[in-house]
Amino acid sequence: MGVAATGSGQVPSAVTASPISFNADTGTLNAVIFNTTSDITQKSNVTEITDAVSIIDKLQGVEFDLTLYGTKSAGVIAQALETVLPHLVSTDHNGIKSVNYAGLTGYLIEAIKELGRNR
């Protein structure tokens, strides 16, 4: 299922009083909570993340201005992330890359745990 937006607006929710809103001018999608499916029944080949600090050390967090909207943001550069964790980067039909930031969470959790063990 997909949702096509031809302009700004809101998608009302039958469950909560907080709708999903989309601003076509800024490319901003807002919701109270974004969930990512994480149920074990939907996964296969589950393995532990090892050497997470080494992986995270190869990444660079950056601040930047979004050229299309002129707004300040922070994150990673998809092309740089792709050299380290290519499965967290997608490329659309125009060649524009996007990042699965939720996918970084497991690496960050394990890196923090590794750092804690090494204190």
Language-model-derived ranges and their functions:
Residues A5-G7, S13-S44:
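Small/polar residue-rich beta-strand/coil "junction" motifs that cap repeat-based extracellular fibers
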Residues L29-Y101, A111, L115-N118:
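C-terminal intramolecular chaperone/autoprocessing and neck/assembly modules of extracellular spikes
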Residues T6-P12, K113-R119:
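Short helix-capping/linker segments at secondary-structure and domain boundaries
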Residues M1-V3, G106:
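Conserved, well-structured core segments
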Residues M1, I20, V89-S90:
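Assembly/interface hotspot detector across virion components, adhesins/toxins, and nucleic-acid enzymes
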Residues V3-G7, L66-L68:
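Short acidic, glycine-rich loop/turn motifs
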